[in-house]
Amino acid sequence: MSSRPGSGVHGYRADVAFDGERELPDGVLVLVDGELIVGVEPGSAAAPADCPVTHLRGSTLLPGLIDAHVHLCGDSGDRALDQLPSLSDTDRDEIIHRALSAHVQSGVTAVRDLGDVDWAVADHRDTAPGQPHVVASGPPITIAGGHCANMGGEASGRDGLIRAVQQRAERGVDIVKIMASGGLMTVGTDVMASQFTLEELRLVVDQAHRQGLPITAHAHPVPAVRQAVEAGVDGIEHCTCFTAAGFHIPPQLAERIAASGIFVCPTLGRDPGVPVPPRIQAFLERMGLTWELRRPQIRAMYDAGVALIAGVDSGINPAKRHGVLPEAVIELVDTGASVSAALGGATSRAADACGLAGRTGRLRAGLAADLLIVDGNPFTDITALRTPVTVVARGVQAVSQA
């Protein structure tokens, strides 16, 4: 046994398992004491004496999922981001609470918030057992009037950019986010244009790293993605690589992203029963952008060895509501990625990207007891992720349909 369990040990046994990095086809017995995993045993192992065991036959056990791109202040409504500045503290707190509940109900036990307002998420990251871990960036750095400027992160000029990073360090954020291009959810910004010069991006990256902080860049068009890579970012959000001809990532750019160890969150996943917001749908139709065109672009990154992680951009509109991360994993498998790679992008690799590797993301003694048990076997049918039957968040059963 990896660690001696105490008297409060509870076991979770499954016929198939994924430990965050590889499939365990013969199952697993995970022993939990309090908030921590204290043992990871073969599925056939006997449980300690007097240890209750939850065993759902035909189930698969894996680490709790991680949504690496959320906006907890967003209520998933049509005006989720537009209304942020007008929300009262009480309304914001209630939205955040509902969002966290929706995530854990879907099997998500950790989230990375990449854009709030008034530091509402960054200042309230201490969630209780039974709720997801929260990693936060605070308001993203953007140009005056730029993408998500209403979150309060506008900065310009060398001194202004340095102050912006310093402010985030003083607030104790976990990561810095910068809007390297315009975005689809902010009227008046150009999603096909870069928002900062390469020199400015390099300055912000350098300042973040001096503060010991990783930095991720929102980037849609190829020039903005290339700038982010050249500036030395640690992550890229969306990485849609818009061109006049659709979605396309030059092979050399994909190879450079992979060689640099940059994490890419392509923000896949949406509620399949909800239509895309009209203004986004209009843009996609105008540009001729379809999933059939996006699929090979993502596959090209996967084939190049890019470290892909799962994140939905949760909370920004009805189609991107909180709690649909399983759809991001399902879509990645649809591009041709292996099930293990897709699940790793929502567990161990996401934990690495979010600075949570020492806390969660793997079935390992000493890490948080963040567990997901689904009905069925995602290695034969990835849609099994849609049917969580037990969710354990830091040792607390937040969902139990056993």
Question: Model regions: which residues?
Answer:
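Metal-associated gating/positioning segment near the N- to mid-region
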Residues: 59-126, 223, 231
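Active-site mouth loops of central-metabolism enzymes
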Residues: 81-94, 146-163, 214-219
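Histidine/acidic-residue-rich catalytic or RNA/ligand-binding cores of hydrolases
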Residues: 76-79, 186, 225-233, 250, ...
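N-terminal metal-binding scaffold of metallo-dependent hydrolase/deaminase domains
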Residues: 1-48, 60-61, 376-381, 396-397
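His/Asp/Glu-enriched, well-ordered alpha-helical/loop segment
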Residues: 291-377
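C-terminal cap of metal-dependent C-N hydrolases
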Residues: 34, 346-348, 365-402
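Divalent metal-dependent hydrolysis catalytic cores, especially in the metallo-beta-lactamase
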Residues: 93-122, 131-142, 173-186, 213-214, ...
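Histidine/acidic residue-rich metal-binding segments in metalloenzymes
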Residues: 160-239, 243-264, 287-308, 341, ...
